[in-house]
């Protein structure tokens, strides 16, 4: 992890910069969740994977790592609304502070920012992979919602969710 510390600092800077908006609720709400920390596992894995395949790191990889973290944060915001969660990372869920609608819309904003970061890498493969992954995430959430309360799910159906 120490090897990635400089790049992780760049990712943190990008997260703060790209969560900015003249609409005050957006940076307030997004920074509430982003600043709550977390392990930053997804950016670490992104940076480490780039190194493992001989990548030099740099701005494009940091943008990709920030995009992945924004996607993750957006899904957390949406998930807390769908699951009616009261806590996230030991703090009140954003939906309990700003409301469900604001949480969903800021999650949408973070998804949009992630795609902006991806396009800035100028690598359509990244956009293709992460847009497909975002669809899989959304489909999984809808499957989970549709299966809510169903006790007749087969093991395979459960695992598909």
Regions found by a protein language model. Name each.
Residues 101, 105, 113, 137-141:
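Mid-bilayer segments of alpha-helical transmembrane spans in multi-pass integral membrane proteins
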Residues 126-127, 136-139, 144-145:
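Short, well-ordered, mixed-charge alpha-helical segments that flank or form enzyme active sites
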